[in-house]
Each structure stands twice: as structure tokens, then as C-alpha cells.
Amino acid sequence: MPVPFQRVYLQSAGAFLPGAPVDNVQMDDYIAPLNRLSQRIKRRILAENGIRERYYAIDAEGRTVFSNAQLAAGAIRDCLVRGGVALSQVSMLASGSSGGDTLMPGFANMIQGELAAPPMETLSVHGICAAGVGAIQAAAQGIELGAHRSALAVASEMPSRLFKRSRFAARGYETDFDSHFLRWMLSDGAGAVLLSDGAALAGGHGLRLKLKWVHQRAFSGDYPVCMQLGLTEDRERGHLDFGSWAEAEAAGALSLRQDIRLLPHLFDIGIHEYARLVKDGWVDPARVDHFLCHYSSEKFIPVVEDLMTKAGLAIPRERWYSNLAWRGNTGAASILIMLSEFLQTRTLKPGEQIFCYVPESGRFMAAYLLLEVESAGEPSKRAAEPQGRAVLATATMEDDVIAPPHDPAAAPEGLRDLLTELASIWHDYRSQVWRTPLVRQIRERRFAVPDYLNWMAQWVPQVREGSLWMREGAASLTGDHQALAALIDVHAGEEQN
């Protein structure tokens, strides 16, 4: 269930992007080609991801110009200046990142040190893209519980140091595609938000921006690792299992990778989780005025849009906002950088809602948050938590004659409501299946021939029995639904074969 908030407001947002923007031609000065395949992969990836400019915290010689902690500190300073708040007024700092400049201590403590900030509560959220939302939730909970009046959430990423050509020398400048292509996907940057217990939105002209809820859900028990740093390509050994860092580097255990073959599952679970939020009344697509969606490539826009449309829960494209093309993909920082630029460039009105969605490929996670604009002159609204399902439409099944067999994509409103509920049921069922001993054996490559024969001995009779049940059920159909019998018979035949 999402975590609801009654007294948390976004007061200001800031960002820090190092140096000058780097276009697609200039990239080679920072992320030099590794081998003869590099230029071909680069052209393909850039054509798909739609990124025209990005930022790097290293120079053309590969030297670090800004540390990750300095990036985060820069975003915090920008955020505080925009909010007109002194650092001494903040009593909590939560950070989100895939990794700071040190393995220890925590990233939030390194940022606090970089800022020379006074004593305060700190929390370091370690993850990938959703870590920024995790930092926001932690800061918001501190305010909601009354422990803090002002709290900062910051997310910062600096993957460029992993992409320098020199990093691949130990492997003879050769690497697998899962590691190679990310060099043209990710870049550096930081974003920060200042949360408070009631202050007006900075520059909002008499508006407040209320954080309604945050929802995070991980499916790491269902799926294998998709994006990782620290394991070999086959995921059999970790970097600490080698005799030295040099051995780990030569084995590719220090290369950042993403298994793109698993990505379709990420969008599938993300949309199903969104459908559940709609079904339970946490968000109404018709009420969403601005949709801030984090995606790593513009190639995925039609994928997300198509899945939302099929679920009957689409948000019109004109309401979408992204700055991927000119800010780049900055991982955990992306959604905070996006919020900062959105608030600086858009005019908001009371009653508008801002819905944010962040999928994380690391080991599959989906994060969402909902903001609502209020007039600063009005008393704070205490919204009741959703109860049961959201009412998406007033139409009932009796209002429409459904000509079987029907097309779910063109289903009437009453049926769309049912399909939304069924999507949630399928979502839970699939998760349970993925965690069964049988599927775990397959995932972990422990599924041997005897296991397969045993499975088939149990499964084939069940399928045959199921086909008989389908045909018996089809034989009992009458009236308007009798036309479905032929379709069921075809499906039963396919199952049996």
C-alpha cells in the first residue's frame, strides 16, 4: 500500500549539472570508443534513446572535475537558494544513489561533510533509479511523524568514471554488449527537493505543492538481476571473491551491465502496479494533469503508452513531461532533476495533480508519487485514504451489448473496470509463480533432465484435463455468449496440443 501524507509539502527543488552540455559528437572526447564495434553500437543506441545532450563531471582527459558528493552539494545549494532557506534550518538529509565516491561511509554523510552542514539526521538510500524516490519518502516520513519541520532529499549519480576507456584496459578494450551500450546511455547530474510541513512553493505565486503519497514496490524475489555492478557477466562471482581488485577488473566484475533481454518484464510489472493503484483509488488517470515518467530511452515511450492504453488507463501524451533529450539519463537523480526543471518552466494551478513514475531495472522495482497543487491561502486539506476501488466510469455491463467474441482494446467502460481488476489478479499470480521452487530452479540454471521429465509427467495430464473442462464449459454457453464456444474450443485445442 502507498504511504500517505497529510502534512508534507514540496517547498523548492534544485539541480546541478556539471560543466557544459556535451552533444553526441563531443561524447567521444569523454567516452572514447573501445574497439571497432563501438561506433556502430553508439549510432544504434543514440538513435533509439533520443538523447542529444548530457553532462559529465570528468574532463576530456578523464580527470574528475566534480566528485559525486560535490554534485549533490551543488543541487542542494540550488534548491535552498530557490527556497530562500538556510541550511541551518534543515534537520534531515536523505540521499539516493547507486554509489557515492566511497564504499564507506554512507553517501549522505559524505554530502553533509561536503556542505560542512551542522549536525542533523542522515540516511543513505542505496539503489539505482528508484533510490531518489526512496530518499524523498524517507524525508517525507520524518516530517509526517513530526520529527522534522524541514528535510532535504537529494539524488546524485556519476557513472562517467566507470565509462572511461582506461577502465577497460584490463580486458584488452573488449567487453560484452550489456556493458558496452551503457556508455552511451548514462551521464552525470544531481537533483534535490526541500520538503516542509506547510511552506508555500517557492516562486509558486501563492501556491502549495502537497505530497499526497509515495509508493515503492520491489519484485526482486521474482526476477534475476538485470542491472548490476560488482558481478561477473555470468553473475557467478562477486568482485570481493577475487584475490585482488586487478583480478576482479580483468574478469569484468567491475563493469556496469544491464541485461536488456529482461527489460520487457520491468515495464509489464510497472504498468500492472499502476493499474492496481488506479483500482484501489490512489490515482485517477483522468485527474492527472502532468505525468513525469522516468525512462532511459525514448524507444520505451510507445511501449509504456501502449501498455497503459491496453489497460484502459492511458494518460494523454500532451500531459507527459521529460527532459531526457537535453539532460540525459542520470539514474536516481533523473526524477528530481525533472521535477526541478518542470517547476521552473511550468505554471501550475490549484487542483492540478503531478504523477511521477520511476521504474528501476536493477532487480525490478517500481516507484510512484503523487503531488497536488493547493492554494496557499486555503487551510490544509486532510484527504481520506482511498477505500476499495476507484470508480472509473458510471457505465455498467447492462448499459452495453457486448458482441462476443469481443476485443478487450475496444471494451466498454464497465468491462474495462473488470479488466483492471483482472490485471491486478494476474499481477499477484505471476509473482507467486516466479517464486515457486520449479521456476527458481530454471532461473538459477539448476533444472536438469530428470526435473524436466518429472514436470512433464505432472503437467501434461493437467493440461489435457483442463482442455476437457474448457470444452464442457463451452457446451453450456447459451444466448449471447454462445458465439464464444468456438473461440474456447480453439483455445482448448491449442492447450491440448
Question: What is each of the regions a protein language model found here?
Answer:
Residues 1-66, 175-265, 359, 370-396:
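Condensing-enzyme catalytic core mediating Claisen C-C bond formation in acyl metabolism
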Residues 11-14, 96, 126, 151-157, ...:
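Short beta-strand segments
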Residues 22-24, 104-106, 137, 162-167, ...:
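Short acidic, glycine/serine/threonine-rich loops at helix termini
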Residues 69-73, 99-100, 113, 118, ...:
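Claisen-condensing/thiolase-fold acyl-transfer catalytic domains that form or cleave C-C bonds
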Residues 88-96, 285-294:
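Short glycine-rich phosphate-binding loop at a beta-alpha junction
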Residues 97-99, 113-114, 126-142, 153, ...:
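Long, hydrophobic, well-ordered secondary-structure blocks that form the structural core
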Residues 144-186:
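Flexible, glycine-rich active-site loops centered on histidine and acidic residues
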Residues 398-497:
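Non-heme di-metal
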